[in-house]
């Protein structure tokens, strides 16, 4: 929606994701990512509820999606020891495209996140809730 910008900046010698509010330039912390550095390839959902990024845990690179509403961080399992290189989160957070390396080859994989995350809908978009029946 243009309200948020996710950037990678050098903080203490490590690439770190920062979330900036565009209206005033303030930086909003993302505590879920603080233990898993360095960071790369940040991507935001429509309203900025979900922040996807690639993090490092030991020698392993992980693709994660952080839900800023409830504070949960969801690591995305990649089969066969593939390493994420870049990612792009769909605006509604229902899919993510991942560029991965697999035994020296580059691949792009599309993961369905609809069982993991609820949609991040644009402002004003109504939910498709069925009408209540007047009969018991």
Where are the regions that the model predicts?
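Post-signal-peptide N-terminal segment of Sec-exported extracytoplasmic proteins
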Residues: 1-31, 36-37
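Glycine-centered loop/turn positions within well-structured domains
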Residues: 3, 15, 25, 49, ...
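Beta-strand C-termini and the immediately following turn/loop, strongest in propeller blades
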Residues: 7-12, 52-58, 97-103
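Conserved positions at the start
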Residues: 14, 38-41, 83-86
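Multi-bladed beta-propeller domains
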Residues: 22-38, 55, 67-83, 113-136
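Blade-terminus and WD-like Trp-Asp/Gly-His loop motifs, strongest in beta-propeller folds
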Residues: 1-4, 41-50, 87-95, 132-135
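Extracytoplasmic electrostatic interaction patches
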Residues: 74-85, 90, 94-95, 103, ...
